[in-house]
């Protein structure tokens, strides 16, 4: 048991954070080498692991508001860079729209979701290599307590290893990628169910969004914004709550009042892709995510209950929490 985490609260940092990147993982046949960033607290042992999957076009260098928060409070956070990252485009100033354009023009776009899943599995498979590559980390990981976290496309990537199944064009279920090594999940702005909920654009270019959550059995927190309007669905913001209502594993849902797709700015400070910049909203996401994962991995810990009380009694009325 990690006393470093269990005895503390999400309201103050416990340690300085050290980060190392890039660590190169073995990835035979991959177009680009698989790079990861690792962030860890300077002190503590038996540290649980978060593997974070970035959103479309992003990279291992993003999401500092979340990553640094978690690492300062006892988690080792590992961030792979996936092949859709704009950092891999032959343009050092490529923005999000250029990443989308590159994806739409790629003959491999239909397989991109699967490449992400393969890279996520590679990352889990090579935890020993990661541990040995970062000075001061060896012997400090709790490899029995691994959580998957993702935002947007990254949430879909994480959900696939939590048990979500992509539905093929003929209606059959794609391969089952559920991984028994994973103990908890956290899905931020995750796409909902497919079928007629998808726009024609989504059906053509993002067929992996035709998915079923019926076999997602691992305990998971879903966080969505009630103002998240997406060109991928004909539904409204409620589409981003499907993972909670349609899976047996998702046991908590947080809906953020006024939240859009970036949930106040979780991908970075003052980044252009954030349309709902709100430091208080980011703070809520930081605290709620940390607390959920701690209580999910260490059931004797009351961090989730304590943090929900803080959130629901906030005079700013930032949102709601629904459990099942």
Task: Give the positions of each predicted feature.
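N-terminal cap/lid segment of alpha/beta-hydrolase-fold proteins
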Residues: 1-45
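Short beta-strand element of the alpha/beta-hydrolase
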Residues: 46-55
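Conserved alpha/beta-hydrolase "nucleophile elbow" surrounding the catalytic nucleophile
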Residues: 54, 150-155
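Short amphipathic alpha-helix adjacent to the substrate-entry channel of hydrolases
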Residues: 61-90
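Alpha/beta-hydrolase active-site loop
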Residues: 97-143
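Short glycine-enriched nucleophile-adjacent loop
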Residues: 128, 155-168
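The feature captures the conserved acid-bearing segment of alpha/beta-hydrolase catalytic domains
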Residues: 172-255
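Alpha/beta-hydrolase-fold serine-hydrolase catalytic core, especially in secreted/extracellular enzymes
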Residues: 258-261, 266-324
